[in-house]
């Protein structure tokens, strides 16, 4: 399983219109990632946290994966998911995430101020914490806040697409990635492409060699695009399609699919399926620390 949790959707607000040319470019990017070995990809819709969201839940997600990318999924076997990234500046102007999270598989936060970072690392019910790696970080990243965020299950995202753009973006990317690795102590990191065109796509070997030179061990680089990234998908899907992350509605076909891989069955068939969760050694260590008497 090779996962990319960040392929940008060509729309920055609900008021923008998506052109067929932009969708075709996105399909080419997804096809390129499939050729490079990726099996699970999340399409990322980035919007400001203070923007007015539609009242109708059906209008919250403009991506519409089944209609736009159903043929691509059937032809290639790709598993596509929807993700929303909320740009957080002033927490007082934000809206509740309960309605938003119902429409997307993954919810991420992108703080651009110190207050936004504090809110993202403490109170928000999110799956991912990411940054604008082509710009300066909103504040100095402290071990205490970032590690507490990782300990409650939120993963940190590194977007390598900024390393393939202009000189200023590359310079800032190197500085920001080192800060994220330092503050998180190399824990809870996932890697996404942020690819806006097929030319910005890289395979796992190219990404590993890049991020390893910035301080992340090579074994954690492979986990960042595999096990940990799939855990983000699992947590996000279980938020809406389970009861206490144990029993989910949908599926039930008996073909062995789970809540991550059963992209359409969970939404189409209203039956009951039991999902067994497993924890790796690192997660078990965190759990034992939190439950010490």
From Swiss-Prot:
GO terms for molecular function: ribonuclease P activity; RNA binding. One of its GO terms (cellular component) is ribonuclease MRP complex. Keywords: Hydrolase, Nucleus, rRNA processing, tRNA processing. Its main location: nucleus. It catalyses: Endonucleolytic cleavage of RNA, removing 5'-extranucleotides from tRNA precursor. It is an enzyme of class 3 (hydrolase). It is found in: Nucleus. Its EC number is 3.1.26.5. Gene3D superfamilies: Metal-dependent hydrolases (3.20.20.140). GO terms for biological process: intronic box C/D snoRNA processing; maturation of 5.8S rRNA; nuclear-transcribed mRNA catabolic process, RNase MRP-dependent; rRNA processing; tRNA 5'-leader removal; tRNA processing. InterPro entries: Pol/histidinol_Pase-like (IPR016195), RNase_P_p30 (IPR002738). It comes from the Eukaryota. It holds the Pfam family RNase_P_p30. Belongs to the eukaryotic/archaeal RNase P protein component 3 family. Component of ribonuclease P, a protein complex that generates mature tRNA molecules by cleaving their 5'-ends. Also a component of RNase MRP, which cleaves pre-rRNA sequences. Component of nuclear RNase P and RNase MRP complexes. RNase P consists of an RNA moiety and at least 9 protein subunits including POP1, POP3, POP4, POP5, POP6, POP7, POP8, RPP1 and RPR2. RNase MRP complex consists of an RNA moiety and at least 10 protein subunits including POP1, POP3, POP4, POP5, POP6, POP7, POP8, RMP1, RPP1 and SNM1, many of which are shared with the RNase P complex. Present with 6300 molecules/cell in log phase SD medium. This is Ribonuclease P/MRP protein subunit RPP1. The gene is RPP1.
């Amino acid at each position: 399983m090779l996962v990319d949790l960040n392929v940008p959707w060509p729309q920055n607000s609900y008021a923008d219109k998506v052109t067929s040319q932009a969708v075709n470019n996105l399909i080419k990017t997804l096809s390129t990632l499939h050729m490079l070995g990726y099996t699970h990809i999340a399409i990322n819709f980035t919007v400001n946290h203070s923007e007015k969201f539609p009242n109708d839940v059906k209008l919250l997600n403009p991506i519409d994966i089944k209609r736009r990318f159903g043929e691509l999924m059937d032809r290639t076997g790709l598993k596509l998911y929807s993700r929303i990234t909320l740009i957080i500046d002033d927490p007082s102007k934000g809206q509740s995430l309960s309605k938003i999270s119902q429409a997307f598989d993954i919810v991420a936060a992108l703080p651009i101020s110190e207050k936004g970072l504090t809110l993202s690392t403490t109170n928000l019910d999110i799956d991912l914490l990411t940054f604008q790696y082509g710009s300066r970080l909103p504040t100095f990243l402290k071990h205490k806040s970032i590690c507490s965020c990782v300990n409650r299950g939120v993963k940190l995202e590194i977007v390598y697409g900024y390393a393939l753009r202009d000189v200023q973006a590359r310079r800032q990317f190197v500085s920001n990635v080192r800060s994220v690795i330092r503050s998180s102590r190399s824990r809870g990191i996932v890697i996404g492409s942020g690819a806006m065109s097929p030319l910005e796509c890289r395979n796992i070997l190219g990404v590993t060699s890049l991020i390893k030179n910035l301080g992340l061990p090579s074994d954690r680089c492979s986990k960042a695009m595999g096990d940990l990234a799939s855990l983000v998908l699992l947590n996000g899907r279980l938020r809406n399609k389970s009861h206490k992350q144990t029993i989910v509605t949908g599926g039930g076909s008996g073909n062995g699919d789970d809540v991550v891989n059963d992209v359409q069955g969970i939404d189409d068939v209203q039956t009951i399926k039991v999902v067994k969760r497993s924890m790796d050694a690192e997660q078990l260590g965190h759990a034992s620390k939190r439950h010490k008497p």
